[in-house]
């Protein structure tokens, strides 16, 4: 009972966070742009883009304008004539938004510090390795092979900007800061400028990316925190009890009523959502809810989530955004891998005295494969090959030196091998390696105005050494006389804990 009250009761230490005065401090903008600081020490998200136009002279000019301005107003009819933003509207807006994003992270960081301080005398779990994208796959290997069904969910983004403000007002109690937030959201009122939803997994525009990442993460955190609470307590509620909790505005006002509800000993308890083998994973605007239960249970969870988003966030969320799939018969695109749970048949011979038996066993195994068609499509988009996978030269890099060209091709190849080292089958990777290697040779041959055959004869094996992956280098040093049995080592899956993002193939254009 005390645990329920602690969850429902808002954190009183976060009730009075006056963050608005910090927007007038110069050091806030220095911290936001990581001046003189280690970039890895960012609280929630490392600033992905750095604007070289920032200088303390511009910051001083911006702060002076904010001091002289009595209020933030923006004319929707004639925004170009706004006296506050002036001709540097884009630059000033980006600076303020980045500074504001850094400021509103403070309540979340304080909550994180307070939660860590509660572990006094206990061993605090080191979560640095959990930042890696690959840290999710060992979890899937251990748990998903025993499950039956999965819900593939496309998380809806808020269609109204006021939803984002209402989400943050439970953390930031400073009214001035919330008004400033509304100012920027109405400045970028067009959602197409915030979120690009050309693909099922949408992403944010590059402009003010940190600011919008923070807003989106706070919105998703609000979804998941309420959802997890309802999930943990669902077995103690009647079928109509959880519906009253969907309105977060009155969430804290129902404490007394909830205490009475939980204090009663129900004769009939609803166990529709009671499932100890439920696992939830979120990634790239999507989420997965896997269970060992039946199709009926997953269908009830599906309609529960649809009603949750519609009632809680006033979203027109239809059932087509949630798909129920059987793990053994479906492959999904998960973090660049094609993952599935397949049956691995095996034959066991049992000998009992004079009789022998053959036993067929089918073991479920979590399988991860490289999606060859999308990967070749990415290479074709970056002008390394055609859409059919035929290598072509890279004319844009022809003006570079030979060492730079080889280094760039080799770096892309090593990055791809490094990220897809967890693949169950490496044959696809060697095809990608062949495309990049031949594309590099054709680029060098184009530069020196010769044929590929002539260039390869002249370069020898040096070009091959540049395309050795880190795994191959380690194995070649450990086993200088590799035998055919080493092929099993190449086929083994390797997960790394130092991968924090997926490298863009066109990053070096």
From Swiss-Prot:
GO biological process: mRNA processing; RNA splicing; tRNA processing
GO CC terms of this entry: chloroplast
Keywords: Chloroplast, mRNA processing, Plastid, RNA-binding, tRNA processing
GO molecular function: RNA binding
Major place of residence: plastid
Any Pfam family hit: MatK_N
Subcellular localization, as worded in the UniProt entry: Plastid, Chloroplast
KW Chloroplast (keyword) present: yes
Key word RNA-binding present: yes
Family the UniProt entry places it in: Belongs to the intron maturase 2 family. MatK subfamily.
Biological role: Usually encoded in the trnK tRNA gene intron. Probably assists in splicing its own and other chloroplast group II introns.
Name of this protein: Maturase K
Organism in which the protein naturally occurs: Nicotiana plumbaginifolia (Leadwort-leaved tobacco)
């Amino acid at each position: 009972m005390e645990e329920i009250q602690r969850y429902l009761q808002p954190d009183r230490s976060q009730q009075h966070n006056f963050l608005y005065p910090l927007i007038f401090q110069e050091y806030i903008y220095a911290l936001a742009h990581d001046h003189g600081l280690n970039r890895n020490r960012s609280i929630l998200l490392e600033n992905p883009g750095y604007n070289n136009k920032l200088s303390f002279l511009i910051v001083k000019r911006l702060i002076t304008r904010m001091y002289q301005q009595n209020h933030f107003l923006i004319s929707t009819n004639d925004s170009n004539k706004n006296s506050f933003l002036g001709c540097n509207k884009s630059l000033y807006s980006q600076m303020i938004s980045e500074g504001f994003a850094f400021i509103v992270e403070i309540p979340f960081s304080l909550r994180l510090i307070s939660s860590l301080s509660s572990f006094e005398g206990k061993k605090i779990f080191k979560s640095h390795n959990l930042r890696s994208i690959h840290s999710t796959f060992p979890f899937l290997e251990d748990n998903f092979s025993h499950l039956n069904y999965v819900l593939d969910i496309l998380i809806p983004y808020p269609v109204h900007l006021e939803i984002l403000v209402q989400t943050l007002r439970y953390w930031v109690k400073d009214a001035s800061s919330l008004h400033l937030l509304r100012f920027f959201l109405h400045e970028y009122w067009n959602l197409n400028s915030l979120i690009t939803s050309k693909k099922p997994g949408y992403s944010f525009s590059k402009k003010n990316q940190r600011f919008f990442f923070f807003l989106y993460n706070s919105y998703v955190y609000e979804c998941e925190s309420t959802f997890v609470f309802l999930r943990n307590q669902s077995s103690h509620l009647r079928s109509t009890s959880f519906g009253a909790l969907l309105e977060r505005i009155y969430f804290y006002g129902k404490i007394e009523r909830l205490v009475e509800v939980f204090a009663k000993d129900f004769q009939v308890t609803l166990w529709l959502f009671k499932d100890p083998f439920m696992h939830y994973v979120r990634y790239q605007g999507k989420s997965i809810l896997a269970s060992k239960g039946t199709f009926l249970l997953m269908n009830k969870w599906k309609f529960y989530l649809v009603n949750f988003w519609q009632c809680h966030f006033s979203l027109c969320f239809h059932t087509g955004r949630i798909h129920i799939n059987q793990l053994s018969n479906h492959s999904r695109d998960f973090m660049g891998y094609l993952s599935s749970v397949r049956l691995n048949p095996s034959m066991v011979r049992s000998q009992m005295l004079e009789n022998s038996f053959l036993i067929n066993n089918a073991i479920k195994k979590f399988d991860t494969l490289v999606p060859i068609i999308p990967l070749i499509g990415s290479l074709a988009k970056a002008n390394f090959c055609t859409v059919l996978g035929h290598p072509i030269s890279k004319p844009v890099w022809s003006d570079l030196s030979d060492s730079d060209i080889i280094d760039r091709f080799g770096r892309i190849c090593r990055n791809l091998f490094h990220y897809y080292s967890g693949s169950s089958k490496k044959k696809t990777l060697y095809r990608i390696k062949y495309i990049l290697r031949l594309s590099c040779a054709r680029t060098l041959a184009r530069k020196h105005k010769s044929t590929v055959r002539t260039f390869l004869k002249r370069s020898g094996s040096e070009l091959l050494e540049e395309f050795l992956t880190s795994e191959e280098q380690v194995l070649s040093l450990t086993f200088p006389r590799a035998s055919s049995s080493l092929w099993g080592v190449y086929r083994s899956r390797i997960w790394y804990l130092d991968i924090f993002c997926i490298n863009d193939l066109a990053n070096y254009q």
